[in-house]
């Protein structure tokens, strides 16, 4: 039974909570000195869609912008760009992974681009659900995160868009940066060529989180290592044309040795090579064209026995190759009319070679025996994908800005042809207040790399289709104080069936676990209200406060089931204090309702020999709930300025008051005579983790 595609009474109640806040917020302005009006923006720079958050040195053209230098002073772990985004309303993730969820949607429903190229699963240590992103945070100069309602420029994703841009230092002189922390080292160098017409940058990282784990006494069975390197060279062909060449290589290895369990050895690599042409032939016409090649390789091997009895032998080798051409252009037809159009064509091939031998206990005719399961799958799917769009931004005489758009996407591998109409609108109510709204449909075809071959899948599913409904209000209360209110609803049909480990997500052999469950929702719905209040300053005290009331659920067999990262209530408080240009202190407190989880019980099965076997029974998916989560992170940053260099040191305390937060429970049977009870032990997230980092720039 699908969710009804209408505004539900609960959504109406959410609106009744939020809307009365607006006049109170606006009334507060009368007690403030009116801030100066912002400089006039060109129509192409105006933010029309709601649900847009930015990080960059440029402010004013992106709502709720945070500068890169400010982001660098906030508490963080691993200097990871994906982990840093968890502070944005609507974004959720646990301590172990960088793969954040957006308004109840998994990270695979997010489109990520770096300098114009689409990234595919851009994470290190995928056996730990992607512990870190393959992008070096200091290299990112600007980003936009669109948590919903994005325009027709973006296709083949149903939830969100993340645009990341790198840039060169303001100084044209060569520059070098070296960084060292407990978990890794990094280096970057920027130079120039062809006089002042060409610039290049090389960055490299090598991580050894296993050493940090040893120092913390956490785990002596994990041996993770990762590395990545990126290169960019820009050449100014003329004042109106710039050509850039880019390369990104990332790899990681993981060895897991557990006593009385099989050993895992995995190796992942990602390679991207692309060229980008950016053109501004005149003041009215602008565009870019990107030609890219990508290859992802997976080599995952496991061998041994559980309890020295149940054998396991696993070989999982995969490869994905893509060639893509994308071209987007915008034309200013008049000061009040902007036309954008473009296309993207992709050819992709993939390979799956999967072999499994697994022994399990089974009871047959009252006898406990060992049954062997085997799998031997070899697939070579391939296909082409094509998308095109057209959108027009119109400014009416009454200051209302409309952006209707239409998108078409074709995927030969799945046979999908999807037409997606979209509409965004922005109405400046005053120099300080803007009302925004968006509606549209969004289709996402299953990627060739997304087949769950270990679970027996050999055919791709049809495209998912989501409908977004969003309304938002942004108001500047004072020169450095702003308020944002948003209400959203996302309805999804043709939801793709998937396999979840509903009890323990973090298992190095997920496909053989008893909690591996096929979930085939008939529909899905996410809705909520978000409030963001922030005060930003270059000096002194700045802060941010946000609250989100949300619900994300799926319809399974006629029952509404919460999504795996459903967070009913989320609160985040952040504060920074710049004592002077040398010292900066920051704190971040995060709270959210406990995530859904799945309970386990045991039953006793009598055997012919008079003994009993404790059979594990996995309960309904996500029918239970974990305790609430909260933690405090702290960071202190100190800078030393020298004649030709700068040294920056930082000290972080992750989970400063050592809160025990849970990711789930480990279950075991306790047998007493003819009865069995279920014992559960908490599985913790990260404890108090101190870390130190040093960066030298010269």
Regions found by a protein language model. Name each.
Residues 45-150, 161-168, 184, 530:
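Periplasmic N-terminal accessory/gating domains of Gram-negative outer-membrane beta-barrel systems
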Residues 130-133, 141-151, 158-191, 200-206, ...:
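Short strand-turn segments of transmembrane beta-barrel domains in outer membranes
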Residues 181-206, 219-253, 265-293, 333-337:
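Transmembrane beta-barrel wall of Gram-negative outer-membrane proteins
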Residues 288-292, 296-298, 428, 463-521, ...:
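Membrane-embedded beta-barrel scaffold of Gram-negative outer-membrane proteins
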Residues 320, 330-338, 344, 376-493, ...:
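Structural signature of Gram-negative outer-membrane beta-barrels, strongest in the C-terminal barrel
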Residues 354-356, 363, 427, 431-470, ...:
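Surface-exposed extracellular loop regions of Gram-negative outer-membrane beta-barrel proteins
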Residues 396-399, 491, 513-599:
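Gram-negative outer-membrane beta-barrel transporters
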Residues 582, 590-612, 627-631, 637-698:
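C-terminal beta-signal and adjacent terminal beta-strands/loops
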């Amino acid at each position: 039974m699908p969710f009804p595609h209408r505004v539900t009474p609960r959504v109406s109640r959410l609106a009744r909570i939020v809307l009365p806040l607006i006049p109170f917020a606006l009334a507060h302005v009368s007690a403030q000195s009116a801030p100066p009006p912002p400089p006039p923006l060109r129509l192409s720079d105006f933010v029309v869609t709601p649900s847009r958050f930015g990080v960059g040195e440029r402010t004013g053209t992106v709502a709720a912008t945070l500068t890169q230098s400010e982001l660098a002073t906030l508490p963080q772990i691993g200097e990871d760009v994906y982990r840093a985004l968890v502070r944005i309303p609507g974004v959720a993730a646990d301590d172990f992974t960088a793969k954040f969820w957006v308004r109840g949607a998994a990270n695979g429903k997010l489109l990520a681009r770096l300098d114009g190229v689409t990234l595919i699963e851009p994470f290190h240590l995928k056996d730990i659900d992607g512990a870190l992103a393959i992008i070096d945070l200091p290299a990112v100069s600007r980003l936009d995160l669109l948590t919903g309602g994005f325009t027709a420029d973006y296709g083949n994703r149903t939830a969100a868009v993340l645009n990341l841009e790198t840039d060169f230092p303001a100084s044209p002189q060569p520059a070098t940066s070296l960084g060292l922390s407990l978990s890794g080292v990094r280096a970057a160098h920027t130079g120039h060529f062809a006089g002042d017409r060409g610039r290049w940058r090389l960055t490299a990282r090598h991580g050894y989180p296993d050493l940090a784990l040893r120092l913390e006494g956490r785990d002596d069975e994990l041996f993770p290592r990762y590395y990545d390197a990126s290169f960019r060279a820009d050449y100014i062909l003329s004042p109106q044309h710039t050509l850039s060449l880019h390369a990104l290589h990332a790899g990681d290895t993981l060895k897991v040795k557990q006593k009385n369990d099989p050993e895992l050895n995995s190796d992942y690599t990602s390679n991207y090579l692309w060229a980008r042409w950016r053109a501004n032939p005149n003041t009215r016409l602008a565009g870019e064209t990107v030609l890219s090649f990508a290859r992802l390789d997976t080599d995952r091997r496991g061998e041994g026995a559980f309890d020295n009895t149940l054998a396991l032998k696993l070989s999982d080798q995969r490869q994905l190759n893509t060639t893509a051409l994308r071209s987007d252009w915008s034309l200013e037809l008049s000061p009040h009319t902007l036309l954008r159009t473009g296309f993207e064509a992709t050819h992709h091939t993939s390979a799956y070679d999967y072999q499994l031998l697994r022994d399990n206990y089974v009871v047959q005719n009252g006898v406990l025996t060992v049954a062997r399961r085997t799998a031997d799958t070899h697939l070579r799917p391939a296909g082409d994908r094509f998308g095109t769009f057209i959108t027009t931004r119109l400014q009416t005489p009454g200051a209302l800005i409309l952006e209707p758009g239409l998108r078409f996407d074709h995927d030969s591998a799945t046979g999908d042809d999807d037409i997606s109409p979209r509409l965004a609108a922005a109405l400046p109510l005053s120099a300080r207040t803007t009302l925004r709204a968006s509606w549209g449909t969004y289709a996402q075809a299953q990627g060739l790399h997304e087949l769950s071959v270990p679970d027996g899948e050999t055919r791709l599913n049809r495209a998912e289709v989501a409908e977004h409904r969003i309304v938002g209000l942004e108001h500047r209360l004072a020169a450095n104080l702003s308020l944002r209110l948003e209400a959203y609803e996302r309805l999804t049909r043709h939801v793709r069936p998937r396999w979840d480990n509903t009890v323990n997500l973090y298992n190095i052999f997920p496909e053989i676990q008893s909690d591996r469950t096929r979930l085939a929702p008939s529909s899905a719905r996410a809705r909520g209200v978000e409030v963001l209040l922030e005060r930003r300053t270059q000096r002194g005290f700045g802060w941010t406060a946000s609250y989100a009331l949300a619900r994300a659920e799926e319809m399974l067999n006629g029952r509404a089931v919460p999504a795996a990262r459903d967070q009913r209530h989320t609160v985040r408080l952040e504060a920074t204090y710049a004592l002077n240009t040398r010292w900066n202190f920051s704190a971040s407190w995060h709270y959210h309702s406990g995530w859904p989880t799945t309970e386990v019980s045991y039953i006793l099965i009598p055997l012919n020999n008079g003994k009993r076997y404790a059979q594990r029974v996995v309960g309904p998916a996500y029918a239970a709930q974990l305790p609430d989560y909260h933690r405090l992170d702290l960071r202190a940053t100190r800078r030393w300025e020298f004649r030709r260099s700068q040294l920056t040191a930082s000290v972080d305390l992750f989970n400063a008051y050592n809160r025990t937060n849970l990711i789930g429970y480990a279950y075991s049977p306790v047998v007493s005579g003819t009865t069995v009870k279920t014992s559960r032990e908490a599985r913790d997230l990260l404890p108090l983790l101190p870390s130190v980092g040093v960066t030298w720039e010269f």
